[in-house]
Amino acid sequence: MLFGLVSRHYVEFSQDTLISGGKFKGCTASAGQIACVEAQADGAYLLPVWRGEMHLTDEIGAYHPFADWETAEPGDIIGGFTTFYGKQQGHGKAAAREHNISEGVKRIDGVAVEREETFSFNALCAPYRHSNDYELAPNVSTDGFGYGGGVCQVTTTLYNAALTLPLQIEEWALHSKQGAVYVPQFFDAAVGNYSDFTFVNLLPYGVQIHASAQNGVLTVLFCRAEEDSQ
């Protein structure tokens, strides 16, 4: 099974497209949304979905390679990753889980990380409490629920996007040996009030994070920042 640990292309959907794969029951990406994909030697494209994969056709959208980070110009997309979510993860609280995903995405979208700067997810998103606009939703814990449940899917997507670039992971934790169903085993990234996800930007320029979550499609992209710190 091929899963996009290094996604070198992305697709911008030109039409509504049903996404399914692995044990994921499906969602529908809308025209204009972006997902990170794997380009094959034969010219085909694979979309990693929940430890499975979906073969994509040329008709569903336009495919673009990520810019090489060594030669990228300001504004170029240099890396990214996509995961998928749906009602089957909600255990009766799907709307709350989706709210928390949207809350996490909102807080990291547009954030710039200068060269040699350390990014901290919790600095932007914690604490995971009702008073910080999070809702009670399923998570990986003793009782299976907690405020902010679902935010770890944002962290996991960000983590896998970071793995495609010279970004040094400083702090990272797994949920458990089984991991999260929406990525390969050992490629999830857990956060909580006492655990963070951090990385250092080792690129020779600043980067900007672009994150979006809509219709069950969660994508995190890294772009070369428009203005570099000297």
Question: Residue locations for each model-derived region?
Answer:
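Well-ordered beta-sheet/strand-loop patches within structured domains
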Residues: 3-8, 12-19, 25, 29, ...
